[in-house]
Amino acid sequence: MDTGGDEKRARRSEEDRLSNLPESLICQIMLNIPTKDVVKSSVLSKRWRNLWRYVPGLNVEYNQFLDYNAFVSFVDRFLALDRESCFQSFRLRYDCDEEERTISNVKRWINIVVDQKLKVLDVLDYTWGNEEVQIPPSVYTCESLVSLKLCNVILPNPKVISLPLVKVIELDIVKFSNALVLEKIISSCSALESLIISRSSVDDINVLRVSSRSLLSFKHIGNCSDGWDELEVAIDAPKLEYLNISDHSTAKFKMKNSGSLVEAKINIIFNMEELPHPNDRPKRKMIQDFLAEISSVKKLFISSHTLEVIHDLGCELPLFRNLSSLHIDFEDHTLKMLSTFLQSCPNVKSLVVEFKDSSKEDGDRVLSIPRCFFTTLEYVKIERPITGEARGMKVVSYILENSPILKKLNLCLNSSREKSESVILKELLTIPRLSTSCKVVVFEPRSCWVLG
């Protein structure tokens, strides 16, 4: 059989199918491919020879070039091409030693593409040098812009902002010329739907205010090595549906008008690395108010660190009446907190548990938890492999013995030096189940067991 010939014909058939597409569609496909690879497509056929020249965007990384001059020359030549359509996308990644020249060139390139009805601006500086690129003010008045993604640059104080179409903003370790720049940008983008901010101590913002009538999704990552009590995030977004906060440095989180919230992921310790003082009433009230604002969610992830702060401060939990899906990351010593938290979720149906070893000496308290019935729980997944040790088995027992309508419990099995898989399975079979219809599905590396 001529398998080589068949492969060539199949390859030609794929090429022909792609070539039969309209040029405008091919150019849109190429928009998501690194521009150097797009240029290489010119050797495919006569039709493809100049097609790359009409791709309405640039996607380029410095490390794709032999040296700095080749990098600059390529970008300059591409931007100099005549185009009938707008310049839709400018994606730039650079990491080079030519600091002064790079700053000048990047600003010049941004000004060029902004004047061509740019829709997507994505600039990432991997240099991490002493001086960053300051984004030119022309970006603030790019009325065609839809998506703005920046990393390791400086945003200047705007005199005028006109960004009526911007829906997505992602800022990663960005500096601001003053503390109000980001607040101005957010409040001026009337179509903003998604906001991601990854912060560091260099951004010089003590109080971050996120006020938006249109915002649907907000993710906040705090990367400050040291926190202080002045750091605060205040959110006022009445249409917000998705909230994701991972931050151990910011001391205060405040929310209002959060009735539209559907899903939240919370990993916060409110700048409380040390054991909090139980009489810190202002801190306790702030945390209680924050929890009350997110209590309308239907889906929630909450970390063991957050649970511990809530527990140690003696915070009163609100009722999460709408919550149907709960994902909890907890350690051995916080199992009691899991039980307490579940009592505040009267309608939860699905529970995912990430169960980790505790470094604390009081981990044995897991064995003495007051009984509590989880009357609505139908599905549970334990993500940590069960090895047969007492604490892991106690988690399984606690759920099975207190869930009257549980339908399925999924867990992974991992044999240990002390116990083989068969011994662990036998122990699982002896655990009483409050639900008569519950199935325990046990996954191990080579098989799956259903303990009916």
From Swiss-Prot:
It comes from the Eukaryota. It comes from Arabidopsis thaliana (Mouse-ear cress). SUPFAM superfamilies: F-box domain (SSF81383), RNI-like (SSF52047). Residues 361-413 form the FBD domain. Residues 15-65 form the F-box domain. Keywords: Leucine-rich repeat, Repeat. This is Putative F-box/FBD/LRR-repeat protein At1g78760. Coiled coil: none annotated. LRR repeats lie at residues 125-152, 174-199, 221-247, 279-304, 327-355.
